[in-house]
Amino acid sequence: MKKTLAALIVGAFAASAANAAVVYNNEGTKVELGGRVSIIAEQSTSNRKDQKHQHGSLRNQGSRFNIKVTHNLGDGYYALGYYETRFINKDIDGNEKNIGSGFGSITTKLAYAGLGNKELGEATFGLQKTIADKISTAEDKEYGVIEKNSYIPTEGNAIAYTYKGIEGLTLGASYVFGGRNFSDYEITDGKVSNAVQVGAKYDANNIVAGFAYGRTNYKAQQAKTQQVNGALATLGYHFDDLGLLISLDSGYAKTKNKADKHEKRYFVSPGFQYELMEDTNLYGNLKYERINSVDQGEKVREHAVLFGIDHKLHKQVLTYIEGAYARTRTNDKGKTEKTEKEKSVGVGLRVYF
Protein backbone atom coordinates (compact mmCIF):
# COMPACT_ATOMS: atom_id res chain seq x y z
CA MET A 1 0.00 0.00 0.00
CA LYS A 2 1.27 3.45 -0.87
CA LYS A 3 2.24 5.59 2.12
CA THR A 4 0.77 9.04 2.62
CA LEU A 5 3.13 11.97 2.25
CA ALA A 6 2.48 13.05 5.82
CA ALA A 7 3.70 9.67 7.05
CA LEU A 8 6.79 9.94 4.89
CA ILE A 9 7.68 13.32 6.30
CA VAL A 10 7.38 12.03 9.86
CA GLY A 11 9.21 8.81 9.09
CA ALA A 12 12.00 10.02 6.82
CA PHE A 13 12.65 13.63 7.74
CA ALA A 14 12.16 13.39 11.51
CA ALA A 15 13.71 9.98 12.04
CA SER A 16 15.96 11.07 14.89
CA ALA A 17 12.98 11.91 17.10
CA ALA A 18 10.85 8.95 16.00
CA ASN A 19 13.65 6.43 16.58
CA ALA A 20 14.87 7.71 19.95
CA ALA A 21 15.61 4.72 22.16
CA VAL A 22 13.93 4.47 25.55
CA VAL A 23 16.76 3.38 27.86
CA TYR A 24 14.87 3.75 31.14
CA ASN A 25 11.16 3.73 31.94
CA ASN A 26 10.19 3.12 35.55
CA GLU A 27 7.97 4.72 38.21
CA GLY A 28 6.93 7.60 35.96
CA THR A 29 10.43 8.47 34.76
CA LYS A 30 11.41 7.94 31.13
CA VAL A 31 14.84 8.53 29.59
CA GLU A 32 15.26 8.62 25.80
CA LEU A 33 18.49 8.74 23.80
CA GLY A 34 18.72 9.71 20.14
CA GLY A 35 20.81 11.36 17.48
CA ARG A 36 22.55 10.75 14.21
CA VAL A 37 25.91 10.60 12.47
CA SER A 38 25.69 12.55 9.22
CA ILE A 39 28.35 12.92 6.51
CA ILE A 40 28.26 14.82 3.22
CA ALA A 41 30.63 14.86 0.22
CA GLU A 42 30.21 18.12 -1.66
CA GLN A 43 31.48 20.32 -4.45
CA SER A 44 30.95 24.10 -4.20
CA THR A 45 31.64 27.01 -6.54
CA SER A 46 31.23 30.70 -5.75
CA ASN A 47 31.89 33.91 -7.65
CA ARG A 48 32.28 36.84 -5.26
CA LYS A 49 34.17 40.12 -5.56
CA ASP A 50 35.19 39.17 -9.12
CA GLN A 51 36.98 36.07 -7.84
CA LYS A 52 36.00 32.47 -8.48
CA HIS A 53 36.39 29.93 -5.68
CA GLN A 54 35.91 26.20 -6.08
CA HIS A 55 36.43 23.43 -3.57
CA GLY A 56 35.39 19.91 -2.66
CA SER A 57 35.13 18.45 0.81
CA LEU A 58 34.01 15.52 2.91
CA ARG A 59 32.63 16.84 6.17
CA ASN A 60 30.23 16.56 9.07
CA GLN A 61 26.66 17.61 8.34
CA GLY A 62 24.82 18.21 11.58
CA SER A 63 25.81 15.07 13.50
CA ARG A 64 24.26 15.19 16.96
CA PHE A 65 23.38 13.41 20.18
CA ASN A 66 20.40 14.14 22.40
CA ILE A 67 18.89 12.97 25.65
CA LYS A 68 15.37 13.65 26.92
CA VAL A 69 14.11 12.98 30.44
CA THR A 70 10.42 13.09 31.40
CA HIS A 71 9.00 12.74 34.92
CA ASN A 72 5.29 12.07 35.46
CA LEU A 73 4.09 14.32 38.32
CA GLY A 74 0.53 13.02 38.38
CA ASP A 75 -2.85 14.55 37.44
CA GLY A 76 -1.63 15.08 33.86
CA TYR A 77 1.38 17.19 34.86
CA TYR A 78 4.97 16.38 33.97
CA ALA A 79 8.50 17.79 34.11
CA LEU A 80 11.01 17.48 31.30
CA GLY A 81 14.63 18.14 30.43
CA TYR A 82 16.34 18.07 27.03
CA TYR A 83 19.97 18.30 25.99
CA GLU A 84 21.49 18.19 22.48
CA THR A 85 25.07 18.47 21.25
CA ARG A 86 26.75 19.47 17.98
CA PHE A 87 30.30 19.61 16.66
CA ILE A 88 31.89 23.01 16.17
CA ASN A 89 35.15 24.24 14.61
CA LYS A 90 36.87 27.26 16.18
CA ASP A 91 39.88 29.34 15.25
CA ILE A 92 42.69 30.33 17.62
CA ASP A 93 40.56 33.17 19.04
CA GLY A 94 37.62 30.88 19.78
CA ASN A 95 35.46 32.12 16.89
CA GLU A 96 33.24 29.60 15.11
CA LYS A 97 34.47 28.75 11.60
CA ASN A 98 32.89 26.65 8.86
CA ILE A 99 36.17 24.99 7.92
CA GLY A 100 37.85 21.61 7.95
CA SER A 101 35.98 18.35 8.45
CA GLY A 102 33.31 19.87 10.68
CA PHE A 103 34.19 17.43 13.46
CA GLY A 104 35.62 19.86 15.98
CA SER A 105 34.86 20.33 19.65
CA ILE A 106 31.57 19.09 21.06
CA THR A 107 29.32 21.98 22.04
CA THR A 108 25.84 22.45 23.45
CA LYS A 109 23.20 23.20 20.82
CA LEU A 110 20.03 22.97 22.93
CA ALA A 111 19.53 22.65 26.68
CA TYR A 112 16.25 23.38 28.43
CA ALA A 113 13.88 22.23 31.16
CA GLY A 114 10.22 22.78 31.77
CA LEU A 115 6.84 21.85 33.19
CA GLY A 116 3.77 20.82 31.25
CA ASN A 117 0.24 19.51 31.23
CA LYS A 118 -1.43 17.63 28.39
CA GLU A 119 -4.41 19.98 28.40
CA LEU A 120 -2.83 23.27 29.50
CA GLY A 121 0.39 23.27 27.47
CA GLU A 122 4.10 23.38 28.23
CA ALA A 123 6.44 26.06 29.61
CA THR A 124 10.16 25.63 28.96
CA PHE A 125 13.25 27.58 29.99
CA GLY A 126 16.69 27.57 28.39
CA LEU A 127 18.43 27.28 25.04
CA GLN A 128 15.74 26.07 22.65
CA LYS A 129 13.98 26.36 19.30
CA THR A 130 11.21 28.95 18.96
CA ILE A 131 7.88 28.76 17.13
CA ALA A 132 9.48 30.56 14.16
CA ASP A 133 11.54 27.43 13.45
CA LYS A 134 8.32 25.60 12.50
CA ILE A 135 7.04 28.27 10.09
CA SER A 136 8.21 26.83 6.79
CA THR A 137 7.26 23.79 4.74
CA ALA A 138 10.04 23.57 2.13
CA GLU A 139 12.32 20.56 2.66
CA ASP A 140 16.12 20.57 2.61
CA LYS A 141 18.93 18.54 4.11
CA GLU A 142 21.87 20.96 3.91
CA TYR A 143 21.62 23.84 1.42
CA GLY A 144 18.38 25.47 2.57
CA VAL A 145 17.85 28.72 0.67
CA ILE A 146 15.36 30.20 3.16
CA GLU A 147 17.11 32.19 5.91
CA LYS A 148 14.38 32.66 8.51
CA ASN A 149 16.73 34.12 11.12
CA SER A 150 16.93 37.34 9.09
CA TYR A 151 13.22 37.81 9.85
CA ILE A 152 12.62 36.16 13.25
CA PRO A 153 15.14 34.25 15.42
CA THR A 154 14.47 30.51 15.28
CA GLU A 155 16.32 29.66 18.49
CA GLY A 156 17.85 31.27 21.53
CA ASN A 157 18.05 31.39 25.31
CA ALA A 158 14.34 31.78 25.92
CA ILE A 159 11.26 31.38 28.05
CA ALA A 160 8.69 29.65 25.84
CA TYR A 161 5.10 28.45 26.02
CA THR A 162 3.80 25.77 23.65
CA TYR A 163 0.26 24.43 23.35
CA LYS A 164 -0.58 21.22 21.45
CA GLY A 165 -3.98 20.37 22.95
CA ILE A 166 -5.73 20.27 19.56
CA GLU A 167 -4.67 17.64 17.04
CA GLY A 168 -2.41 19.11 14.38
CA LEU A 169 -2.27 22.57 15.99
CA THR A 170 0.77 24.11 17.69
CA LEU A 171 0.60 27.51 19.39
CA GLY A 172 3.77 29.15 20.64
CA ALA A 173 5.05 32.29 22.32
CA SER A 174 8.54 33.09 23.58
CA TYR A 175 10.77 35.76 25.02
CA VAL A 176 14.42 35.49 23.94
CA PHE A 177 17.21 36.88 26.11
CA GLY A 178 20.44 38.32 24.77
CA GLY A 179 23.69 36.41 25.20
CA ARG A 180 26.37 38.26 27.18
CA ASN A 181 30.14 37.84 26.96
CA PHE A 182 31.84 36.17 29.91
CA SER A 183 34.63 38.78 29.81
CA ASP A 184 32.66 42.02 30.24
CA TYR A 185 29.06 40.80 30.52
CA GLU A 186 28.09 42.93 27.53
CA ILE A 187 26.19 41.88 24.41
CA THR A 188 28.33 41.73 21.27
CA ASP A 189 27.49 44.16 18.46
CA GLY A 190 25.12 42.58 15.97
CA LYS A 191 23.76 40.01 18.45
CA VAL A 192 20.23 39.76 19.86
CA SER A 193 19.56 41.97 22.89
CA ASN A 194 16.04 40.64 23.39
CA ALA A 195 13.14 39.39 21.30
CA VAL A 196 9.49 38.46 21.61
CA GLN A 197 7.48 36.35 19.19
CA VAL A 198 4.16 34.54 18.82
CA GLY A 199 2.98 32.07 16.23
CA ALA A 200 0.79 29.14 15.24
CA LYS A 201 1.20 26.09 13.00
CA TYR A 202 -1.54 23.73 11.78
CA ASP A 203 -0.72 20.46 10.01
CA ALA A 204 -3.68 18.09 9.71
CA ASN A 205 -6.43 17.06 7.28
CA ASN A 206 -4.02 17.54 4.34
CA ILE A 207 -3.60 21.25 5.19
CA VAL A 208 -0.44 23.00 6.33
CA ALA A 209 -0.74 26.60 7.54
CA GLY A 210 1.42 28.68 9.83
CA PHE A 211 2.19 32.25 10.83
CA ALA A 212 4.61 33.92 13.25
CA TYR A 213 5.33 37.52 14.20
CA GLY A 214 8.37 38.74 16.09
CA ARG A 215 10.02 41.93 17.31
CA THR A 216 13.77 41.59 17.78
CA ASN A 217 16.21 44.14 19.21
CA TYR A 218 19.87 43.82 18.24
CA LYS A 219 22.90 45.47 19.84
CA ALA A 220 24.29 48.01 17.35
CA GLN A 221 27.46 50.07 17.46
CA GLN A 222 27.89 52.88 19.99
CA ALA A 223 25.32 51.30 22.33
CA LYS A 224 22.49 51.99 19.87
CA THR A 225 19.66 49.62 19.02
CA GLN A 226 18.59 47.97 15.80
CA GLN A 227 14.99 46.76 15.82
CA VAL A 228 13.55 44.21 13.39
CA ASN A 229 9.79 43.66 13.09
CA GLY A 230 9.34 40.46 11.10
CA ALA A 231 6.68 38.00 10.02
CA LEU A 232 6.84 34.50 8.53
CA ALA A 233 4.03 32.54 6.87
CA THR A 234 3.61 29.12 5.27
CA LEU A 235 0.78 27.42 3.42
CA GLY A 236 0.66 23.95 1.91
CA TYR A 237 -1.63 21.15 0.81
CA HIS A 238 -1.13 17.37 0.74
CA PHE A 239 -2.47 15.51 -2.31
CA ASP A 240 -2.33 12.06 -0.72
CA ASP A 241 -3.55 10.19 -3.81
CA LEU A 242 -0.67 11.68 -5.80
CA GLY A 243 1.93 11.53 -3.03
CA LEU A 244 2.46 15.27 -3.51
CA LEU A 245 2.79 18.26 -1.20
CA ILE A 246 2.87 21.77 -2.63
CA SER A 247 3.74 24.76 -0.46
CA LEU A 248 4.41 28.47 -0.36
CA ASP A 249 6.68 30.05 2.25
CA SER A 250 7.07 33.81 2.68
CA GLY A 251 8.45 36.46 4.99
CA TYR A 252 8.56 40.22 5.54
CA ALA A 253 10.71 42.35 7.84
CA LYS A 254 11.33 46.02 8.49
CA THR A 255 14.54 47.13 10.20
CA LYS A 256 14.86 50.37 12.14
CA ASN A 257 18.52 51.11 12.73
CA LYS A 258 19.53 54.17 14.73
CA ALA A 259 23.20 53.66 13.91
CA ASP A 260 22.88 52.85 10.20
CA LYS A 261 20.47 52.60 7.26
CA HIS A 262 16.88 51.34 7.58
CA GLU A 263 15.86 48.25 5.61
CA LYS A 264 12.82 46.45 4.26
CA ARG A 265 13.03 42.87 3.05
CA TYR A 266 10.71 40.13 1.87
CA PHE A 267 10.84 36.71 0.23
CA VAL A 268 8.50 34.23 -1.44
CA SER A 269 9.35 30.57 -1.94
CA PRO A 270 7.10 28.01 -3.69
CA GLY A 271 8.08 24.39 -3.14
CA PHE A 272 7.08 20.75 -3.49
CA GLN A 273 7.70 17.28 -2.06
CA TYR A 274 6.83 14.23 -4.16
CA GLU A 275 6.91 10.50 -3.42
CA LEU A 276 8.58 8.90 -6.44
CA MET A 277 8.24 5.41 -4.95
CA GLU A 278 8.13 3.85 -1.53
CA ASP A 279 10.94 5.28 0.62
CA THR A 280 12.15 7.59 -2.19
CA ASN A 281 11.20 11.26 -2.31
CA LEU A 282 11.92 14.21 -4.57
CA TYR A 283 11.79 17.76 -3.22
CA GLY A 284 12.66 21.30 -4.18
CA ASN A 285 11.84 24.99 -3.90
CA LEU A 286 12.51 28.34 -5.54
CA LYS A 287 13.13 31.61 -3.71
CA TYR A 288 12.98 35.26 -4.65
CA GLU A 289 14.18 37.70 -1.99
CA ARG A 290 14.53 41.47 -2.10
CA ILE A 291 16.18 43.87 0.35
CA ASN A 292 15.75 47.63 0.02
CA SER A 293 17.69 50.28 1.90
CA VAL A 294 15.10 52.92 2.76
CA ASP A 295 17.62 55.73 3.32
CA GLN A 296 20.44 55.10 0.84
CA GLY A 297 18.81 53.55 -2.23
CA GLU A 298 20.68 50.24 -2.10
CA LYS A 299 18.75 47.25 -3.49
CA VAL A 300 19.64 43.57 -3.20
CA ARG A 301 17.83 40.85 -5.15
CA GLU A 302 18.43 37.13 -4.78
CA HIS A 303 17.13 34.27 -6.91
CA ALA A 304 17.75 30.76 -5.57
CA VAL A 305 16.71 27.22 -6.40
CA LEU A 306 17.15 23.92 -4.56
CA PHE A 307 16.42 20.32 -5.60
CA GLY A 308 17.06 17.04 -3.84
CA ILE A 309 16.19 13.37 -3.75
CA ASP A 310 16.40 11.08 -0.72
CA HIS A 311 16.04 7.35 -0.17
CA LYS A 312 15.61 5.34 3.02
CA LEU A 313 17.81 2.24 3.01
CA HIS A 314 16.46 1.35 6.46
CA LYS A 315 14.18 3.02 8.97
CA GLN A 316 17.32 4.53 10.52
CA VAL A 317 19.48 5.05 7.41
CA LEU A 318 18.87 7.87 4.91
CA THR A 319 20.82 8.77 1.77
CA TYR A 320 20.33 11.85 -0.37
CA ILE A 321 21.62 14.00 -3.21
CA GLU A 322 20.97 17.75 -2.98
CA GLY A 323 22.00 20.78 -4.98
CA ALA A 324 21.38 24.53 -4.79
CA TYR A 325 22.13 27.59 -6.88
CA ALA A 326 21.85 31.25 -5.84
CA ARG A 327 22.44 34.51 -7.70
CA THR A 328 22.55 37.83 -5.86
CA ARG A 329 22.48 41.24 -7.54
CA THR A 330 23.32 44.40 -5.61
CA ASN A 331 22.48 47.87 -6.93
CA ASP A 332 23.97 50.73 -4.95
CA LYS A 333 23.14 54.30 -5.90
CA GLY A 334 25.82 55.70 -8.21
CA LYS A 335 27.75 52.40 -8.42
CA THR A 336 28.02 49.54 -10.89
CA GLU A 337 25.75 46.56 -10.29
CA LYS A 338 27.46 43.66 -8.51
CA THR A 339 26.53 40.04 -9.19
CA GLU A 340 27.49 37.12 -6.96
CA LYS A 341 26.81 33.46 -7.75
CA GLU A 342 27.06 30.37 -5.63
CA LYS A 343 26.26 26.73 -6.39
CA SER A 344 26.70 23.55 -4.36
CA VAL A 345 25.92 19.88 -4.79
CA GLY A 346 26.33 17.19 -2.17
CA VAL A 347 25.81 13.48 -1.55
CA GLY A 348 24.92 12.68 2.04
CA LEU A 349 24.42 9.76 4.40
CA ARG A 350 22.61 9.85 7.75
CA VAL A 351 22.63 7.00 10.26
CA TYR A 352 20.20 7.53 13.13
CA PHE A 353 20.35 5.89 16.55
Curated annotation (Swiss-Prot):
Transmembrane segments: none annotated. GO terms for biological process: monoatomic ion transport. GO terms for cellular component: cell outer membrane; pore complex. The keyword Transport applies. It comes from the Bacteria. Its main location: membrane. CDD domains: gram_neg_porins. Keywords: Cell outer membrane, Ion transport, Membrane, Porin, Signal, Transmembrane, Transmembrane beta strand, Transport. It holds the Pfam family Porin_4. It is a multi-pass membrane protein. Gene3D superfamilies: Porin. SUPFAM superfamilies: Porins (SSF56935). Residues 1-20 form the signal peptide. GO terms for molecular function: porin activity. It is found in: Cell outer membrane. Forms pores that allow passive diffusion of small molecules across the outer membrane. Homotrimer. Belongs to the Gram-negative porin family. This is Outer membrane protein P2. It comes from Haemophilus influenzae. The lineage of its organism: Bacteria, Pseudomonadati, Pseudomonadota, Gammaproteobacteria, Pasteurellales. The gene is ompP2.
